[in-house]
């Protein structure tokens, strides 16, 4: 076998000409300490704040503390196999989450991984979890209503699209129920919903998802679940991730509702991270930037102007108080950031007044301008009537002889409170609310027994829809009620009342 030098040289030249060097360049560091979900890493000289870093076994962490000689990272997964001396790689990416239509109807964790067993999420669009809130010039005033379907809220504490309305109260007063009812009420509207569960039991989240599925609400809802057994960094990321998913729709000119359930646990998870990273503690051991934690989240709720698509993101943050103390650190912070609060009290809840809204301390600072004209008109005196009733009720407990007008106010107050009661998962269309609140504020329920009110409410609404659809359609527009329509409504309600009483006598 003869070797031909010219052939060898041709092959070598060809190989050299087509040689491509593939060198992967990483900036790597070394683990100095690992424990309690925190890693101290040396050598990541150019790492960015909040950058994603990769640990062995495809476990990711987030760089939170950039110190002189090391980086404090929080780990976003199981870290028992990571040890001192392991290599850590920079990714050059800030934490992002998948966004878009692929997430609608899904249950995901705060980094966008599916948790519902329905297969992978094929999202092609991603957004950083932390983004800047829209500027003053990009916004417009809140002017469109967001109906909750709850009479007590839509009449006295109206919420507008783009508003931030805090739901605050003790444990077990029905805070989550208001958030879920509001999501259920968006069924026939154009609002996408995102429910962010922070630090809740898996069984509770499963129950919420089941309710949403049974009522057909998962067709327009995404659930972001960071359950109680997840590491603190995931609980910390959850609301920002949910907000980013909503912002995608907002910037497309659509409308979004985000329920954060709840920000008390979110603050506790951030306190845990901060103390483990040895940041100096302040009041109630929270770090100094705890206000900024929530303000930068809630400022992302906005109503964009027409040049930016006119989309909106409405936020309903939930805060749990201890023994009704709204003057604690986190409650006062969030009250000052939001555009109003719905305050729920346990006394009303246990007395059977559900939703247990305290109308005296609850307020909506911007929602009034978004309220439907018809609702504004019929519920104008409602808050005052209820406040007077509460005062007189306390006075009447002394057993004093009361004059006729006081007795009348007490009787009307009882009936008004009765119509504001509502069962869970039964949001009411706004036209139904206007009709029934019209009855209360015009004294048309005064001659009925308190026990008959709920029954009469159902009877009246079906009577109006069946016998006077024209009147119902006029009310449905939400426009101001004319004198003529007011007279027609009174006439229809009185007819319905007569028929109701006759039927009662026959069956009684």
UniProtKB/Swiss-Prot annotation:
Keywords: ATP synthesis, ATP-binding, Cell membrane, CF(1), Hydrogen ion transport, Ion transport, Membrane, Nucleotide-binding, Translocase, Transport. InterPro entries: ATP_synth_asu-like_sf, ATP_synth_asu_C, ATP_synth_asu_C_sf, ATP_synth_F1_a_nt-bd_dom, ATP_synth_F1_asu, ATPase_a/bsu_AS, ATPase_F1/V1/A1_a/bsu_N, ATPase_F1/V1/A1_a/bsu_N_sf. Transmembrane segments: none annotated. ATP binds at residues 169-176. One of its GO terms (molecular function) is proton-transporting ATP synthase activity, rotational mechanism. It is found in: Cell membrane. The record marks 362 as: Required for activity. Its main location: membrane. It is a peripheral membrane protein. It comes from the Bacteria. Its EC number is 7.1.2.2. The keyword Ion transport applies. GO terms for cellular component: plasma membrane; proton-transporting ATP synthase complex. Signal peptide: none annotated. It catalyses: ATP + H2O + 4 H(+)(in) = ADP + phosphate + 5 H(+)(out). Pfam families: ATP-synt_ab, ATP-synt_ab_C, ATP-synt_ab_N. Belongs to the ATPase alpha/beta chains family. Produces ATP from ADP in the presence of a proton gradient across the membrane. The alpha chain is a regulatory subunit. F-type ATPases have 2 components, CF(1) - the catalytic core - and CF(0) - the membrane proton channel. CF(1) has five subunits: alpha(3), beta(3), gamma(1), delta(1), epsilon(1). CF(0) has three main subunits: a(1), b(2) and c(9-12). The alpha and beta chains form an alternating ring which encloses part of the gamma chain. CF(1) is attached to CF(0) by a central stalk formed by the gamma and epsilon chains, while a peripheral stalk is formed by the delta and b chains. PANTHER family: ATP SYNTHASE SUBUNIT ALPHA, MITOCHONDRIAL. This is ATP synthase subunit alpha.
